[in-house]
Each structure stands twice: as C-alpha cells, then as structure tokens.
Curated annotation (Swiss-Prot):
SUPFAM superfamilies found in the cross-reference section: P-loop containing nucleoside triphosphate hydrolases
Keywords noted in UniProt: ATP-binding, Cell inner membrane, Cell membrane, Membrane, Nucleotide-binding, Translocase, Transmembrane, Transmembrane helix, Transport
Subcellular localization, as worded in the UniProt entry: Cell inner membrane
Assembly mode: Part of the tripartite efflux system PvdRT-OpmQ, which is composed of an inner membrane component with both ATPase and permease domains, PvdT, a periplasmic membrane fusion protein, PvdR, and an outer membrane component, OpmQ.
Enzyme class, broadest EC rank: translocase
Upper lineage: Bacteria, Pseudomonadati, Pseudomonadota, Gammaproteobacteria, Pseudomonadales
InterPro entries associated with the record: AAA+_ATPase, ABC3_permease_C, ABC_transporter-like_ATP-bd, ABC_transporter-like_CS, MacB-like_ATP-bd, MacB_PCD, Macrolide_Exporter_MacB, P-loop_NTPase
Record's function text: Part of the tripartite efflux system PvdRT-OpmQ required for the secretion into the extracellular milieu of the siderophore pyoverdine (PVD), which is involved in iron acquisition. This subunit binds PVD and drives its secretion by hydrolyzing ATP. The system is responsible for export of newly synthesized PVD after the final steps of biosynthesis have taken place in the periplasm.
Gene responsible for this protein: pvdT
Membrane topology: Multi-pass membrane protein
Binding site for ATP: G43, A44, S45, G46, S47, G48, K49, S50
Residues passing through the membrane, by range: 285-305, 532-552, 590-610, 620-640
Cellular compartments per GO CC: plasma membrane
Protein name (Swiss-Prot/TrEMBL): Pyoverdine export ATP-binding/permease protein PvdT
EC number(s) per entry: 7.6.2.-
Organism: Pseudomonas fluorescens (strain ATCC BAA-477 / NRRL B-23932 / Pf-5)
Length: 657
C-alpha cells in the first residue's frame, strides 16, 4: 500500500491552561492524505478546521500526537526546515487573500521563489507565466487595492503555485467572493487537482465541498465522517508523487539553505524597504529628521572644532616653533617673582644653540591719536623682533639699532591698532601718536598675524625700542620676559636645558625663573582643541542617539502595523533570519538615507559658515565616522524590532488585525 504523503496520528491542539481554562480545539485527529487527492474538510465555524489547516501547513504545531510528512516526523524539524517545507511543499490560498499591500501582483507572486533562491530572470518569467495563465497578465503591476476580490484570490493562487505548489491548502477560498468569482476559483482548484496537485479545501459550504473527491467532516475538533466520492488513484499524474518519491530528510539537507538565496532576498528586502519608506513618506521624513540632525550636528561640530584648531595652530605656528620664552617666577604666590636681568640676556646670547635673543619690556598702555583713545599692548624690544617672530613690516620700516641706542620715540604699530586709530589716515607713516601721553612717531605697520590663542589678538600691539620703553614709559630696565630663537628647531628641548643650566648657575642655584617654548605651547593648545572638538562631537552625538531612538520607535510601530505581512512572508517560506534581515534592512535603509542627507545638510551649513568667515575644516574621517555611526545606530536600534518581528508565531501573525 502506498505510504500517505500526510499522516496525522492522534493530533490534539489545546489553548490556555495554567491560570486560564484549557480549551481543546482538536481532539485526537487521525487523518491520512495521499498524493493526488482533492480533499475537502468541512465544518461549522469553531469546529477546528482552520486550526487543522494551520497544522497541516506547518504554520502551527500540535500539542500532542504525530504528524508524518512523506514519512518524516514534522516534530523533529527545526524552524528553518519547517520554513523550507512551507516554501517547497505547500501553497496557501486564504479567504482574506493575504497579499502584501505595498507589493505589486507580480511581486506578491514571486515572493516564495525569492526565499527559494530562484534566479531573478527565472523568477520573473515564471511569475509572469502564472499570472498570464490565470488571466492577470495586464494586472501584474497593480497593487492589491487596485484589484477586485476575485483577482486578488487568483494572485494568491499564482503565489501558491510559484514553487510548484505540490499541496494547495485553500482556506475558505470563495468565502469573500461573489458567485461568479467563486466559481472561477473553484474551477482553478479543480484544474490543479486534475494535474496531480494535492488540494486540501477548508470550507463550511457543503456545495463547495462537493467539488472535492473526498469529504472529511469535522465537528468540535473531531472527525465525524470521511467519505470518498471517487477513487483517489484516478487523479494521480506524473508529478503527483514528486515529494513522495524522494527522501524528505535528504531534500531538507540539500534545500533548507537555498544556494545564493541571500542575494535575491537582500535585494528584495531593499526594494521592499524603499517601497515602505515611500508609501509612508511623511512618517519616514519625520524619522529621517532625527538622523539628519544628528549626523549634520556631528559633522558640523567636528568641522568647526577642526577649523578652529587649524586656525589657532597656524597662528601660533606663525611665530615659530623654535622660540623659547624666559620670565621671572616664584613657586610661592606670597613672595615676589624672580627677576631676569639684562646681564642674563647677555650671557644667554653667547650660548651656541641660541640664534637670536631679545629682551621685552611691555604692558598695556593708553594710546591716543587725535580724539581717538585706545588701550593696546606696548612692548619695548630690539631690532631682532621681525626675525625672531617671523613678522615682517607691511608698511614703512622697523626701527633701527640707532633708534634703540638713542631711546628714540618711534613706534611700529600692529594691524589692529592701525585699524582702530589711523584707519582714516591714508599713510600712517610719520604720524604721531601719544602713548601714556608721550608722543611717538609711527615709522612702520606690522603685517597682519591674527589671534595667537584664545581671545588674544597678536595684531593689537605697538613695538617701541627697548630703551625708549624703559626710560620714557615704564621706568624699569629689567625685561618682562626674554624671547630666544633656537638655532635648530629640532633641538629646542636641548637648547632649553642648556638655558636652564646657565640660569641656575647665574642665579646661585635658585629656580626663580620659568622657561616655556612655542612647541610645547602649540602641543598644549592642540590637546585643548582636541578636547574641545571631542566635547562638541559628544554633544552632537546625543542628537544622533535621539535619532536612533526615533528609528527604533518607528520600527516597533512598523512591526506592529505589518504583523500580518510577517505572517504572509513566513507562510510563503521565509525563515526567522529572513524576517530579521527584512526589518533590519529597513532600519539600516533609514539610517543610510538619513546619514547621506545629514552629510549633505552639513556641507551646506559648512558653506554658509565659510561665507560668514567662520573657520571650518571638513575631515573625511569625521564625515565617514558620522555616517558609520548612523549606520551602527540603525543596526543597534533596528535590531530589537527586527528580532521581535522574526520571533512572531506564523499563525498569530497571520490572524492579527
């Protein structure tokens, strides 16, 4: 005797239990179905026929009993193998059609083949042929809402046949149709049965059930009659035993992981994600806004921080990285600072590693020209100033050694002082300004340097001969500090050590002086700027985090709204990982689009800031980093909703509203 294709032994299905009362839906079902049979399972509403169909189609598991498919116990199959069985053996035709609303008729039909790993061209050809066979060739691009009920049911039948549809499970296929459409659907099922497909028809209508060759009546979860209207063997055809002729376990081993399927599934996931995003454009835009703001904030903040850093570094570096500063120092704030003398300067000038040295005696002082008053830094120094600080004169000339020797009342003004006091004077050279009410003649204007660090503006200064500053302005011959240019920029540290040793000898071993160098100051400023940039980036990253929470929120809502779609995908053969991939792809797509848009917005904002003369320096690493963060955010915050979707029970998902 031929082994049944489907063999149910004492199948029971119960719900509830524990704190709630147990409800027995199926009570000891024994049923065998052979290849090629056209079976109708008929019963009133609540009789358990739909539950039986779900178990037959591997959408649900029985509470107890054995389900043998082609001789293999279905209870021993894992979720992926059950998905393979649904994909390769079964084709579902539901009363409610269960088509994915956002997909076209052809895309709905192709879905089982996507999960089977069928090549794209072959998939398109087969789907088109099935739709043409069912009279829907002209409607292949229409979405479900653009089709009539009968047309939607025919699309559902085409989908059931996409992977062969060896076993067609039709649950009330005519229940939502008018009589004409219902007759067309039943004619199709008759045709499929005559071609050797196993057709299992679930219905409450005895007239519809009469079309089958075998009628099984179920009541209160029990089979009360099983009547064959003709010999099932008459219906067998060449392909009727296709599944039975091979070892199911081998088929599962070979086919539960379709070769190359992931490529088609990924492409379909991307296309589906884009469709969903486009259909829900307004909601998508609001979700993207969080990602866009987050990415744009990170990129712009880091660009502003980097621009500020480069500007400050360039301005500080413009003074030379080989400069060492010497000044008086006291370790105890209650005692006066040590004094650096001109004798110290003379001794240091003889060190072989010292290229140039200059004493500076300066302070803030009131400056007047005409009726304009201004406070600026006035520094007494010598003719080494332009060389030590690499600071040429833009107009006029620097004062000479003769001016220094004679304590001449001459001054070289900075660019900012020129703008503040002599802006309306065509040629400031030769003009007289009052410094602390002492007249000084302007002999030169320094070139523009800009801010050296923080709020300090290097152009806000006036240079006068050291002797003139000491005698005419401050009355103190000792320098405020000493600027020393090392002969070798790569040996600044060693030069500083030599200066330190000499000063200790000259001051009797007393460390009442302090040494700093531009290189160390630049490094310290760089660290400060880096910290500032990180702070700005961290603040901006909070926006990105908020955007990620928005993605998770919208994906959780999407999973809830599309629960039935998840059930449809599972019924057509999607594994848990396929569902996970689908919804994770959607989350990542949101992040990718939001990330790219955020970068675009950041570049626009950066352009506006540059036009506003704000220092901005975009970094490829920062841009890519922000985009990567958006991507990771999408993966992290999209994983939980996607995982929730993947863990849904197929039956629960299909019956959700």
């Amino acid at each position: 005797m031929q082994t049944p294709l489907i063999d149910l032994r004492n199948i029971r299905k119960s719900y509830g239990g524990g704190d709630s009362p147990q409800v027995d839906v199926l009570r000891g079902i024994d049923l065998s179905i052979h290849a090629g049979e056209f079976v109708a399972i008929v019963g009133a509403s609540g009789s358990g026929k739909s539950t039986l169909m779900n178990i037959l189609g591997c959408l649900d598991r029985p509470t107890s009993g054995e389900y043998l498919f082609a001789g293999e116990n279905v209870a021993h199959l894992d979720s992926d193998e059950l998905a393979w069985l649904r994909r390769e053996a079964f084709g579902f035709v539901f009363q409610g059609y269960h088509l994915i609303p956002s997909a076209s008729a052809q895309e709905n039909v192709e879905m089982p083949a996507i999960y089977a790993g069928t090549p794209t061209a072959e998939r398109h050809t087969r789907a088109a042929a099935l739709l043409e066979r069912l009279g829907l060739a002209s409607r292949s691009g229409n979405r479900p809402h653009q089709l009539s009920g009968g047309q939607q049911q025919r699309v559902s039948i085409a989908r059931a046949l996409m992977n062969g549809g060896h076993i067609i499970l039709a649950d009330e296929p005519t229940g939502a149709l008018d009589s004409h459409s219902g007759a067309e659907v039943m004619a199709l099922l008759d045709e499929l049965a005559s071609q050797g497909h196993v057709v299992i028809l679930i219905t409450h209508d005895r007239e519809v059930a009469a079309r089958a060759k075998r009628i099984i009546e179920i009541r209160d979860g029990e089979i009360i009659s099983d009547t064959a209207t003709s010999d099932p063997s008459v219906q067998l055809s060449a392909n009727a035993g296709a599944l039975q002729a091979v070892d199911l376990r081998q088929r599962l081993a070979d086919g539960s992981e379709p070769t190359g399927a992931w490529k088609g599934e990924l492409l379909e996931a991307i296309q589906a994600a884009w469709r969903v995003m486009w259909i829900n454009r307004f909601r998508t835009a609001l979700t993207l806004l969080g990602i866009i703001i987050g990415v744009a904030s990170v990129v712009v903040m880091l660009a502003v921080g980097e621009g500020s850093k480069r500007q400050v570094m360039a301005q500080m570096g413009a003074f030379g990285s080989n400069i060492i500063y010497l000044s008086g120092y006291s370790p105890n704030p209650r005692t006066p600072e040590g004094i650096v003398t001109l004798d110290d300067v003379a001794a240091l000038a003889n060190l072989p590693q010292v290229k140039r040295i200059m004493a500076v005696n300066g302070a803030k002082a009131g400056v007047r020209f005409g009726n304009a008053d201004y406070m600026s830094y006035v520094g007494g120094n010598d003719t080494n100033f332009p060389e030590i600080f690499n600071w040429p004169v833009a107009q006029g000339s620097y004062f000479s050694e003769a001016d220094e020797s004679s304590a001449a009342a001459v001054a070289v003004i900075g660019h900012k002082v020129r703008e503040k006091l002599l802006k309306d004077v065509a040629n400031p050279i030769g003009q007289y300004i009052l410094i602390e009410n002492v007249p000084f003649q302007v002999v030169g204007v320094l070139s523009e340097k800009g801010a050296s660090s923080g709020d300090s503006d290097s152009d806000d200064r006036i240079a006068v001969p050291y002797s003139a500053a000491s005698i005419r302005l401050f009355g103190d011959h000792n320098p405020q500090y000493v600027a020393i240019a090392a002969a070798d920029a790569s040996r600044v540290k060693q030069t500083e050590q030599e200066i330190d040793e000499l000063m200790l000898r000259m001051h009797g071993g007393k460390r009442d002086f302090e040494l700093t160098n531009n290189a160390a100051m630049i490094q310290a400023e760089a660290r400060t700027q880096n910290t500032l940039s990180l702070m700005l980036g961290a603040i901006a990253a909070i926006s990105l985090l908020v955007g990620g929470i928005g993605v998770m929120n919208i994906m959780l809502m999407t999973v809830r709204e599309r629960t039935r779609e998840i059930g449809i995908r599972m019924a057509t053969g999607a594994r848990q990982r396929d569902i996970l991939r689908q919804f994770l792809t959607e989350a990542v797509m949101l992040s990718v689009v939001g990330g790219l848009a955020g970068i675009g917005v950041a570049l626009i904002i950066g352009g506006i800031l540059i036009l506003s003369e704000v220092a901005v320096a975009f970094s490829l690493a920062a841009v890519l980093g922000a985009f990567a963060c958006a991507l990771v955010t999408g993966v992290i915050f999209g994983f939980m909703p996607a995982r929730k979707a993947a863990r849904l029970d197929p039956v629960t998902a299909l019956t959700s509203e």
